[in-house]
Amino acid sequence: MFSHVTIGSNDVGKAKPFYDALLQPLGLVRHMDYPNAVGYGPADGRPQLWILNPIDKQAASVGNGITIGLEAPDRSAVDAAYKAALAAGGKDEGAPGLRAHYHPNYYGAYLRDLDGNKICVVCHRKP
């Protein structure tokens, strides 16, 4: 559905290690790396998630009501990504667990990145 998603950061240099840690358990790698932007995607693909300083040179700000949902291949990847993100400085917004009010197999975790952007890591598959 989406070509790409961008997440604004006020310090891309600090954001890179955070997103490296978060995305590695999901099988996503850096495809492009610039001083003010970094692009991630599947190893055999192209960058689809960009972390960057806003193009308009204004400060990055958090969108109220916005969550970026990243799909994990299995529940252990949700757990690993959540743990890695917290170890890299992320803030807990909901530990990994089943959230059957979304659907019976929704296993997800919620956190905030170093700039305060809300991220969800979720697996929709049966265990």
Per-region residue spans from a language model:
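A structural feature recognizing the 12-helix transmembrane core of secondary solute carriers
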Residues: 29, 37-40, 61, 69-71, ...
